[in-house]
């Protein structure tokens, strides 16, 4: 398989004024595209990997040949992480979760506001580059963060929501104000997509 950028379900300016057009365009066409290019380069010459998605590769890193494992971890993770990220954003997003995900969040974290507080703290505390995640682990919700482009899938956890806290995701608009960027994220979350991911992961 040749890995490709997923088609964005909205235009670069659709998330304004929350996420700016320039950042979205650079993030997608430069950063994500580089992960796709480098992943394709890494797996070239390994036909045994040709049928595997990026998600499958990072879920089973031990099955990836050792000489390309680091590249697949970084670039396969970058491709899988960003593919999820674009899908859980929406110009019609925001508000609060509904359905099974709402019930599970309240069961695990108390209230939606308490969940937000814990998620924000995980995203703000991630030193350097990485991600904050809401994941399903053994049927229960957890908040975790990962370094660089590491994926929760590599730890057997299924992501429901993910927030990119690499500086490339926010610096043009928010500069060093990561907490402001994190708070803005809640205005553009596609809860319908998050609900689907949660239901599929249970």
Curated annotation (Swiss-Prot):
It catalyses: 2 superoxide + 2 H(+) = H2O2 + O2. Its EC number is 1.15.1.1. One of its GO terms (biological process) is removal of superoxide radicals. One of its GO terms (molecular function) is metal ion binding. Gene3D superfamilies: Fe,Mn superoxide dismutase (SOD) domain, Iron/manganese superoxide dismutase, C-terminal domain. SUPFAM superfamilies: Fe,Mn superoxide dismutase (SOD), C-terminal domain, Fe,Mn superoxide dismutase (SOD), N-terminal domain. Mn(2+) binds at residues 27, 82, 164, 168. Binds 1 Mn(2+) ion per subunit. It comes from the Bacteria. Keywords: Manganese, Metal-binding, Oxidoreductase. Its cofactor is Mn(2+). Signal peptide: none annotated. It holds the Pfam family Sod_Fe_C. One of its GO terms (cellular component) is cytoplasm. Coiled coil: none annotated. Destroys superoxide anion radicals which are normally produced within the cells and which are toxic to biological systems. Homodimer. Belongs to the iron/manganese superoxide dismutase family. This is Superoxide dismutase [Mn]. It comes from Listeria monocytogenes serovar 1/2a (strain ATCC BAA-679 / EGD-e).
